[in-house]
Amino acid sequence: MEIPIYTSSIEGLELIETFLWEPEHGAPDIDLHLERMCKSAGKLKFKFESSKIWEKIHKINSENRLRCRLTLTIDGKFNLTTAVLQPNSKKWIIGLSNSVLSSADPWLLHKSSNRELYDTERAKLPDGLD
């Protein structure tokens, strides 16, 4: 049995995709990112017009590698922001949470601004862990 998701009860809810853009290749996996966003939009009853999003993505132009963040609101408004992707000069030290996730939690299937679980767990990390 599928658990319903009540998107209207979460103020400012957005779907999120973050992707790489490179001067020589554009956004290599953008098809996969937009497919995932489209599926989530359909499931969560978000308006999704891929042609407008594609138009915006095709206008990206930079001599640098970019970290791009695409957000979509329930009424179909989207925002695309970019930032120069700086080389990572340090080793990452990671930590694992002791919390057990529930496969019944429908929010784990969607990349959204509903990130309470992630924020709570990240706040528990000791200094120096990524």
Enumerate the language-model features and the residues they cover.
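Helix-start/capping segments and mature chain N-termini
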Residues: 1-67, 71-130
